[in-house]
Amino acid sequence: MIHLFCLSRYRLYVKINKKVIKMLNRQKNDYYFNIFLNLARAMYMQLEKDWDKEAKLCGISYAQQHALWLLHVQDGLTLEELGNIAIWNKSTTSALISRLEKKGLVEKRKDEGSRLIRIYLTEEGYKKIDESTNTKECIEYMGLFKDKEEEDVVRVLSLMKELVDEIHQGKNPDFNTFINEYSQN
C-alpha cells in the first residue's frame, strides 16, 4: 500500500515537473524571442536611419538606394521580383522605380519573346551606387565583419537566414532565391 502511494506520488511529481519544465521552456523561449526581436529592431532602425542620411546626401531616399543596391547585385529583376526581395508591395515598388526612372538611374526593358519587363541600372545608376556607398560611414558599415572570424560571420548569417526561412515559411521564393544566390558569391 505504501509502495503504491509512493509510486502514484512520484507520477504526480513527474507530471507536475513536466508542466513546470514546459512552462520554464516557454518562458525561456519567450525571453530569447523578445531579445531577438529587440536586437533585430534596434539594428534595423539604426541602419535605416544612417543609410537614409547617407542616401539623402546623394539626392536619393533610403528606399531608392536600397532598390539601386539590389539591382547592382542582381540587375534585370522584374518589378515583382524586386518588390518581393525588398519586401515592398506592388504599388510602392512601381512608384519607386518610376521615380528612379525619371532621375535616369534605371531603365525598363522588355524581354524578347516575353511580356516580362525587367529593370536595369543605367550608367548614372551605377555612378549613384558608387557615390552613395563610398562615404566614410558606409565603408565603416560594410566593414563591420572585417575583424571577425569568417566562421563566426558565416555562423551568424546562417542562423539569421534560418530564422528568416522559419518566419517566411517559403512565402517569398524571390527573396529566398536572391539570398541563396547572393550568399554563394
What are these regions (language model features)?
Residues W69, S98-R99:
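Core alpha-helical elements of the protein kinase catalytic domain
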Residues M1-C58:
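N-terminal leader segment of winged-helix/HTH proteins
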Residues N38-R41, M45, K49, K53, ...:
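Generic detection of well-ordered alpha-helical segments
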Residues R99-R155:
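Charged, amphipathic alpha-helical coiled-coil/dimerization segments
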Residues K49-T92:
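N-terminal helix-turn-helix DNA-binding core of bacterial DNA-binding proteins
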Residues N134-N185:
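Terminal interaction helix/tail motif
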